[in-house]
């Protein structure tokens, strides 16, 4: 069967939730037995988000094959079973880099390189290549219609709509329908102007998804349909909700999936959304709550830790607990003490880079260890747990990471200079290598030790998890640290790199070098996060007596 394409654009304002809407539609179509993928086309000039500030851009989501991508790909994986790869996200910078490299090699035979056709052709090529083998490919265009940065992408999808034909393409446009309190009514004019802007570049939307803080009245739906030349049944209202996992059923109730399948002439069964109904039931019927102290350096923007936040919520669903996250700037622990940790039920230290706030993370790890509070360390959170234990238990007072102090007397954490990438190829780097794309990235095998908490939670000796790091535990210090009571319970497939450490004397102290948050989903959860929140629930009961 030929691939069918749904192109998703946004108008009026940014951050309308195109990614959530696209993922929710994909979830319904997948529930109808269709093989679905989603792509995100980002209009910024960066080659990828790998070196962008998390405070500006949000988290970097890592795919199975090691691509550093937009956080929307995390939404995609949480809503559908398809695993994202490097083909599912590319930027203006990536496209231009490829075209310029090919021009320097002489591949264009001296032609003048232009946005049309060279840039648009490369965009089209990547869209087609990344969509092969799927029944439906949903293509989300980042930014807002009217932005100068988005023009090459919009022109490319306009051309694809013509070349592939209407029988296999559909354009879905998200807009904002604001409510004006002074007038006491919703206003459709911004949507009308947004569609007018889209039509001016040759794209007529087939579906409008109208975001609002309330239900869209039938009269306004008719008005929007009249002025935008969109069928009234294809004007979909999408009011604000308290859980993004309600959106698939909301879109299903308005027959958006039927509009899609009829457009593409697809004969498939009705959507079975019972898994999503179970998620919503778990979410709305908790048996208790826990508070997790989340000690990070980018906490002013929760989206910097989007997948961790979601993984904690998923673990709450599986344990029937509401997870309250208390964000704590690690620098505050350095300057204001540990009072914010005193009534938490668990402590989590996530990944990060650089030495700012590192002492605060060490304080958090020490507080969890000394007070027997469940602790989960991720990536840098594992490294600080190792450093803290080395300093305060193993007697290595000069312990540190060479990332923070190249001349420390006990470098228990150091730069990885050689490793295998996700495809099995050897990678080399040193401290002078570029920052972008030079980490140990992607899904890697990890072997779990018998008798460990990790093995009990995962239920199997070999697992695969995704990585994003340059620094690793120095193997020369494993023996003295294990003699002092720490236990290494997970190694890389070649036994060269430490993946998991545990403190057997502690009720629940587990730290991992990989990023388990990237594989957690609302339907399945994740073994580590489920175990962590279960331990938090038990600690909460004991704490309250």
UniProtKB/Swiss-Prot annotation:
Activation and inhibition: Allosterically activated by GTP, when glutamine is the substrate; GTP has no effect on the reaction when ammonia is the substrate. The allosteric effector GTP functions by stabilizing the protein conformation that binds the tetrahedral intermediate(s) formed during glutamine hydrolysis. Inhibited by the product CTP, via allosteric rather than competitive inhibition.
The protein's enzyme class: ligase
Outline the extent of the Glutamine amidotransferase type-1 domain.
291-542
Q: Does the keyword Ligase apply?
A: yes
**A biological process (GO) annotation for this entry?**
'de novo' CTP biosynthetic process
Start and end residues of each stretch annotated as Amidoligase domain? 1-266
Which of this chain's residues are annotated to bind CTP? 14, 147-149, 187-192, 223
Q: In which pathway does it act?
A: Pyrimidine metabolism; CTP biosynthesis via de novo pathway; CTP from UDP: step 2/2
User: Which amino acids does the record list as binding ATP?
Assistant: 15-20, 72, 239-241
Keyword annotations for this protein, in alphabetical order, are:
ATP-binding, Glutamine amidotransferase, Ligase, Magnesium, Metal-binding, Nucleotide-binding, Pyrimidine biosynthesis
Q: Which residues bind Mg(2+) per the record?
A: 72, 140
Enzyme Commission code: 6.3.4.2
List GO molecular-function terms, semicolon-separated: ATP binding; CTP synthase activity; glutaminase activity; identical protein binding; metal ion binding
Binding positions for L-glutamine per the UniProt entry: 352, 380-383, 403, 470
Catalytic activity of the protein? UTP + L-glutamine + ATP + H2O = CTP + L-glutamate + ADP + phosphate + 2 H(+); L-glutamine + H2O = L-glutamate + NH4(+); UTP + NH4(+) + ATP = CTP + ADP + phosphate + 2 H(+)
One Pfam family from the UniProt entry? CTP_synth_N
Additional facts recorded? CTPSs have evolved a hybrid strategy for distinguishing between UTP and CTP. The overlapping regions of the product feedback inhibitory and substrate sites recognize a common feature in both compounds, the triphosphate moiety. To differentiate isosteric substrate and product pyrimidine rings, an additional pocket far from the expected kinase/ligase catalytic site, specifically recognizes the cytosine and ribose portions of the product inhibitor.
Tell me how this protein assembles: Homotetramer.
Identify this protein by name: CTP synthase
Lineage of producing organism: Bacteria, Pseudomonadati, Pseudomonadota, Gammaproteobacteria, Alteromonadales
Tell me the gene name. Answer: pyrG
């Amino acid at each position: 069967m030929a691939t069918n394409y749904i192109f998703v654009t946004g108008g009026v304002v940014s951050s309308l939730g195109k990614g959530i809407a696209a993922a929710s539609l994909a979830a319904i179509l997948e529930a109808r037995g269709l093989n679905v993928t989603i792509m995100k086309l980002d209009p910024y000039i960066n080659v990828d988000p790998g070196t962008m500030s998390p405070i500006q851009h949000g988290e970097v989501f890592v795919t199975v094959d090691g691509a550093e991508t937009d956080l929307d790909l995390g939404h995609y994986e949480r809503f559908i079973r398809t695993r994202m790869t490097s083909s599912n996200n590319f930027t203006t910078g990536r496209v231009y880099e490829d075209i310029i490299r090919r021009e320097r090699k002489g591949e264009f035979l001296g032609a003048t390189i232009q946005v049309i056709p060279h840039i648009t052709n490369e965009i089209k090529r990547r869209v087609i290549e990344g969509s092969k083998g799927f029944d439906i490919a949903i293509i989300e265009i980042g930014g807002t219609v009217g932005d100068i940065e988005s023009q090459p992408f919009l022109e490319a999808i306009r051309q694809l709509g013509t070349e592939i034909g209407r029988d296999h393409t559909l354009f879905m446009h998200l807009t904002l329908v604001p409510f004006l309190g002074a007038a006491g009514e919703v206003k459709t004019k911004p949507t009308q102007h947004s569609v007018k802007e889209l039509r001016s570049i040759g794209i007529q939307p087939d579906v409008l998804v109208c975001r609002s803080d309330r239900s869209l009245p039938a009269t306004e739906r008719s008005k929007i349909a009249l002025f935008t030349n969109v069928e009234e049944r294809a004007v979909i209202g999408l009011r604000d909700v308290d859980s993004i996992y309600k959106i698939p059923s909301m879109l299903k109730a308005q027959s958006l999936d039927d509009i899609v399948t009829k457009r593409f002439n697809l004969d498939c069964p009705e959507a079975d959304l019972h898994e999503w109904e179970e998620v919503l039931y778990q979410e709305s019927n908790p048996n208790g709550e826990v508070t997790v102290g989340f000690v990070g350096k980018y906490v002013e923007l929760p989206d910097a830790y989007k997948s961790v936040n979601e993984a904690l919520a998923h673990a709450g669903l599986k344990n029937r607990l509401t997870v309250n996250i208390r964000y704590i700037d690690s620098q505050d622990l350095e300057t204001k003490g540990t009072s914010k940790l005193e009534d938490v039920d668990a402590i989590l230290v996530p990944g990060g880079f650089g030495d700012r706030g590192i002492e605060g993370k060490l304080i958090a790890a020490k507080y969890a260890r000394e007070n027997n509070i469940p602790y989960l360390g991720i990536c840098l959170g594992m490294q600080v747990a190792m450093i803290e234990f080395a300093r305060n238990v193993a007697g290595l007072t000069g312990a540190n990471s060479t990332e923070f102090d190249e001349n420390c007397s006990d470098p228990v954490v150091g730069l990885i200079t050689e490793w295998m990438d996700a495809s099995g190829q050897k990678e080399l780097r040193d401290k002078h290598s570029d920052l972008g794309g030079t980490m140990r990235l992607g899904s890697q095998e990890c072997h779990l030790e018998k008798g460990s908490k990790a093995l009990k939670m995962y239920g199997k000796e070999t697992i695969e998890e995704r990585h994003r790091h340059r620094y690793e535990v120095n193997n020369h210090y494993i023996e003295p640290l294990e003699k002092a009571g720490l236990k290494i319970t997970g190694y890389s497939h070649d036994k060269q790199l430490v993946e998991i450490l545990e403190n057997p004397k502690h009720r629940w102290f587990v730290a991992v070098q990989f990023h388990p948050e990237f594989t957690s989903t609302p339907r399945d959860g994740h073994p580590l996060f489920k175990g962590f929140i279960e331990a938090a629930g038990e600690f909460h009961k004991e704490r309250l007596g």
